[in-house]
Structure formats: structure tokens, C-alpha cells
A protein has these predicted regions:
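Short, low-complexity, intrinsically disordered N-terminal peptides in bacterial proteins
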Residues: 1-10, 34-37, 85-94
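Local sequence-structure signature of Cys/Sec-based thiol-disulfide redox active-site neighborhoods
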Residues: 2-32
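Conserved strand-to-helix beginnings and helix N-cap segments that scaffold or border functional pockets
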Residues: 23-26, 52, 80
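Thiol-based oxidoreductase modules, predominantly thioredoxin-like and allied folds used
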Residues: 38-50
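N-terminal beta-loop-helix "entrance" segment that forms/cooperates
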Residues: 48-58
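Structural micro-motif
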Residues: 57-66
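Non-catalytic, surface beta->alpha helical segment in thiol-disulfide oxidoreductase systems
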Residues: 68-94
Length: 94
């Protein structure tokens, strides 16, 4: 959980170990967020979440999954243009 004085990450990447599509998505999200100045974090769906329960039931068959501002924006093969558009849309609403 991020410290209370820092905003939550705008982009969340849900992954699992040994997933080659997750490796590709991580590289894409890292690059796009760096270029756009957006925060991001990665969540392993096989590890216990904040409530102690892994997220594998919700995300397991879809990984990698990208959410921007809490909205699912892609899964399996992540589209860079959709991620950028979601970040731009969120910035306009701020």
C-alpha cells in the first residue's frame, strides 16, 4: 500500500511469474508511463493481496491486465495506443 502522502498509481499491471506476455507488457507500461509522467505498479495475481487473498480468480486467465485509473484497458497483448489514450483521457478529466 502506498504511503498516504503519495497518490495511488494511475496504472496497474496485473501479472504472474513465468508469463512472457507479462514481460512484454511490463516493458511497454514502464516506457509509456515514463514518457507520460504517470505512476504505475505491478501486482502478481498469484500472491496474496491486501486482504490476504490472491487475485488469480479475477485476473488469472487474462494476464497481463492493464488498468488505468481503475478501469481495465487491456489484457493478453497490451495495446500501447489504448494505454496512452486512457492516460490522456484521465489527464483531461483532472
Amino acid at each position: 500500500m502506498p504511503p498516504t502522502d503519495q497518490p495511488a498509481a494511475r496504472v496497474q499491471l496485473f501479472t504472474r511469474s513465468g508469463c512472457h506476455l507479462c514481460d512484454d507488457a511490463r516493458d511497454l507500461v514502464r516506457r509509456v508511463c515514463a514518457e507520460e509522467g504517470a505512476t504505475w505498479d505491478e501486482v502478481d495475481v498469484d500472491l496474496p493481496g491486501p486482504d490476504g487473498v490472491p487475485l488469480r480468480e479475477e485476473y488469472g486467465e487474462l494476464v497481463p491486465v492493464v488498468e488505468v485509473d481503475g478501469v481495465r484497458r487491456g489484457y493478453w497483448r497490451i495495446d500501447e495506443h489504448r494505454v496512452r489514450a486512457a492516460l490522456a483521457d484521465g489527464a483531461r478529466r483532472s
